[in-house]
C-alpha cells in the first residue's frame, strides 16, 4: 500500500544535495544564538548549521529555531557536535570560547581560548576547505591571528569582527550628540577591539564637513566640549551592558550579520575588521588589528590606507604594542 507521501507527491527532479549559501555558527551561547537569529531574520543563508560541544544545549536551541521554521525564509537548519554538519559552508562564524574566571589573568584566558581554537579550526577546514572564517570570540584580534596560523587559509579568508561594532557605537553616540541619524555620521574606531582602540577624530564628518574643521581640539584634553567622552563611552559600552544584563549579544550579532552580508553578497562595503597589519604604519610584527577593509566574496579584497594624523598613528602603534606584548608569549 502506498504511503501518504507517495499518494500526495510526485517527484519530478532530484533535490540538490549541496546548499548554495551555507553559514555555520560555532558556539550556541548568547552571542552565537543572537548571530543565528539575526542571520535567519536577514535571510542570508539557504542553510544554517549550528555546532557546539554541549549536545543538550545545542539540541534545545536548534529545536527552538526549527519549531519557528514557518516564520523564516531559511529552508534548512542542521545541528551537531561533529563538524561534518558544517560541510561546504561558505562562511563559518566562531563565537565559542572560554569565559574568564575569578582571579584569572588575560593571558591565561587567552591561552584557554587558543586551546579551544585548536579543537575547532581543524574540523572546520577539513569539512569546508574553501570557507571564509569570521572570529567573534574575544580577545578577537589575537584569536584572529591564532585562527589564521592554525587554519593555513590566506589572510584574506580569516576575518575578525574587530572594531566594526566599536565604529557603529562611535557613530551612534556622535549622532545622539548632534541629533543626526548614525548612518549620516561618518567616523572610524581602529586598532584593538578593546581598551586601546583609536578614534580617528581627524576623519569624523557629517555630509563631508569634518568636525575637526569646526573644533580643532575635538577629541583632545583641551576640547571644551569634551568630545573625547564619546570614545570613552564606546570603550565602556560593552562593559556597561555586561554589568547590566550579564553578557552582550544583540549589538555584536547585528554587527556580525552586517559583515556576513558584505561577504556573501559581494557588496564591497568597507568595514573596520581585524586583519594583518604588518607592513602598515611601520609595523613589523605579525599583528592583527582593525583597519578599514573592503569585503566581498573573496573575503578581505582590499585595505583602505587611512591618513591618520601624528597623534592617531602613535596611538595605533601603542595599540599594536599592547597586543604584541601579550601575543609574543602565546604557545601555539
From Swiss-Prot:
Entry keyword Transferase: no
Superkingdom of the source species: Eukaryota
Keywords tagged on the record: Cytoplasm, NAD, Oxidoreductase
Catalytic site: 193 (proton acceptor)
Reactions the enzyme catalyzes: (S)-lactate + NAD(+) = pyruvate + NADH + H(+)
PROSITE patterns in alphabetical order: L_LDH (PS00064)
GO CC term (a single one): motile cilium
Localisation: Cytoplasm
Pathway given in the UniProt record: Fermentation; pyruvate fermentation to lactate; (S)-lactate from pyruvate: step 1/1
Modified residues (Blocked amino end (Ser)): 2
Biological-process GO terms, alphabetical: ATP biosynthetic process; flagellated sperm motility; lactate biosynthetic process from pyruvate; lactate metabolic process; pyruvate catabolic process; pyruvate metabolic process
Gene3D superfamilies: Lactate dehydrogenase/glycoside hydrolase, family 4, C-terminal, NAD(P)-binding Rossmann-like Domain
Keyword Oxidoreductase: yes
GO molecular function: L-lactate dehydrogenase activity
Binding site for substrate: 106, 138, 169, 248
Major site of localization recorded for this protein: cytoplasm
Family per similarity comment: Belongs to the LDH/MDH superfamily. LDH family.
Oligomeric and partner information: Homotetramer. Interacts with RABL2/RABL2A; binds preferentially to GTP-bound RABL2.
Described function: Possible role in sperm motility.
Cited PANTHER family: L-2-HYDROXYCARBOXYLATE DEHYDROGENASE (NAD(P)(+)), L-LACTATE DEHYDROGENASE C CHAIN
Protein name per UniProt: L-lactate dehydrogenase C chain
Source organism (scientific name): Rattus norvegicus
Upper classification of the organism: Eukaryota, Metazoa, Chordata, Craniata, Vertebrata
GN (gene name): Ldhc
Amino acid at each position: 500500500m502506498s504511503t501518504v507521501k507517495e499518494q500526495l507527491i510526485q517527484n519530478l527532479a532530484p533535490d540538490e544535495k549541496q546548499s548554495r549559501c551555507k553559514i555555520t555558527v560555532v558556539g550556541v551561547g548568547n552571542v552565537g544564538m543572537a548571530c543565528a537569529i539575526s542571520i535567519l531574520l536577514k535571510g542570508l543563508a539557504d542553510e544554517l548549521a549550528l555546532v557546539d560541544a554541549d549536545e543538550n544545549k545545542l539540541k534545545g536551541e536548534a529545536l527552538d529555531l526549527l519549531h519557528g521554521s514557518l516564520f523564516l525564509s531559511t529552508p534548512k537548519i542542521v545541528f551537531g557536535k561533529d563538524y561534518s554538519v558544517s560541510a561546504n559552508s561558505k562562511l563559518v562564524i566562531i563565537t565559542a570560547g572560554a569565559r574568564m574566571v575569578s582571579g584569572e589573568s588575560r593571558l591565561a584566558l587567552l591561552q584557554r581560548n587558543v586551546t579551544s581554537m585548536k579543537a575547532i579550526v581543524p574540523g572546520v577546514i577539513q569539512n569546508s576547505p574553501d570557507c571564509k572564517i569570521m572570529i567573534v570570540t574575544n580577545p578577537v584580534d589575537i584569536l584572529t591571528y591564532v585562527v589564521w596560523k592554525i587554519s593555513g587559509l590566506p589572510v584574506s579568508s580569516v576575518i575578525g569582527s574587530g572594531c566594526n561594532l566599536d565604529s557603529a557605537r562611535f557613530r551612534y553616540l556622535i549622532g545622539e550628540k548632534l541629533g543626526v541619524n548614525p548612518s549620516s555620521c561618518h567616523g572610524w574606531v581602529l586598532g584593538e577591539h578593546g581598551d586601546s582602540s583609536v578614534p580617528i577624530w581627524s576623519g569624523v564628518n557629517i555630509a563631508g564637513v569634518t568636525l575637526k574643521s569646526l573644533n580643532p581640539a575635538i577629541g583632545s584634553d583641551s576640547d571644551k566640549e569634551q568630545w573625547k567622552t564619546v570614545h570613552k563611552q564606546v570603550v565602556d559600552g560593552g562593559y556597561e551592558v555586561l554589568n547590566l544584563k550579564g553578557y552582550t549579544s544583540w549589538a555584536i550579532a547585528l554587527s556580525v550579520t552586517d559583515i556576513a552580508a558584505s561577504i556573501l553578497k559581494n557588496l564591497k562595503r568597507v568595514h573596520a575588521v581585524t586583519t594583518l597589519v604588518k607592513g602598515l604604519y611601520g609595523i613589523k610584527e605579525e599583528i592583527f588589528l582593525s583597519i578599514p577593509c573592503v569585503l566581498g566574496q573573496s573575503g578581505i579584497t582590499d585595505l583602505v590606507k587611512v591618513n591618520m594624523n601624528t597623534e592617531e598613528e602613535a596611538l595605533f602603534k601603542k595599540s599594536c604594542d599592547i597586543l604584541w606584548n601579550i601575543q609574543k608569549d602565546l604557545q601555539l
